[in-house]
A protein has these predicted regions:
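Alpha-helical membrane insertion/targeting regions
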Residues: 1-237
Length: 237
């Protein structure tokens, strides 16, 4: 049990680290990166709130992990109710933030795609996060499934941070995102196999499909059907 608690604590810390590194230039260490993108009011205020809500989620799962590690299960469950509220905030601000970014003049700042095309990416990240965290809440009395769904849901939320980790220039962002996502799922699968003799169903049927979905997003986004939906959604803000 101690090894298991240490493992999941390390996995959460890895996700926290990716968020801090990815968003350091535009959020956490904004003053140290004068060339980073800026937003005009009221967008700036919204994205500050969005960043705070996402940061609160990351801090919460770290605290929750430490509570379980310290066997403070009762407090962990009480804090879980507040975590539900924060999770809703993450999903809602994620979707609205994507619509806001896509509807501005010039569309999304970095991706070289029309706004209605790229919109699918953050919309799916927020949707997967909501579904997986919802599944974790449903499975809260099944600890092994619960903790894996929390991790994988948070991994989905972290996609925007991972793509911003660009050690070899902007073009390396998607490669880093895919590599880190696959590495995370593989490490989880190896842990499952070594400790239980099999890959946990959540890891197998949620983790790997989550990674593979990355390769289906742009083929779907390039269809006329999605682009029509994307244009309709962007007109809402």
């Amino acid at each position: 049990m101690r090894r298991e608690r240490n493992f999941f604590t390390a996995m959460v810390l890895a996700l926290v680290f990716s968020v801090v590194i990815g968003f350091a230039p535009t959020y956490y260490l904004r003053s140290s990166f004068p060339d980073a993108q800026e937003f005009a009011p009221p967008e700036a205020f919204f994205y500050a709130v969005h960043g705070a809500v996402n940061s609160a989620w990351v801090v919460l799962i770290l605290v929750q992990t430490w509570l379980v590690r310290g066997r403070h299960v009762a407090l962990h469950r009480k804090l879980g109710m507040f975590s539900m509220v924060v999770a809703i905030g993450v999903a809602v601000t994620g979707v609205y933030g994507a619509l806001l970014a896509g509807s501005r003049e010039g569309g999304f700042m970095a991706p070289p795609f029309a706004p209605e095309i790229f919109l699918l990416v953050p919309i799916l990240d927020a949707t997967f996060f909501a579904l997986l965290i919802g599944g974790a809440i449903y499975c809260r009395r099944k600890p092994q499934a619960h903790k894996r769904l929390i991790l994988l849901g948070t991994l989905s939320m972290c996609q925007a941070a991972m793509v911003r980790i660009t050690p070899f220039g902007m073009a390396s962002g998607p490669v880093m995102q895919l590599s880190l996502t696959l590495l995370f799922v593989i490490v989880l699968a190896v842990w499952d196999k070594r400790t239980t003799g099999r890959v946990h169903p959540v890891t197998l049927w949620v983790g790997f499909p989550l990674f593979l979905s990355e390769f289906l997003r742009f083929p779907v986004a390039m269809t006329e059907t999605w682009q029509a939906i994307g244009r309709m959604l962007l007109q809402l803000v």
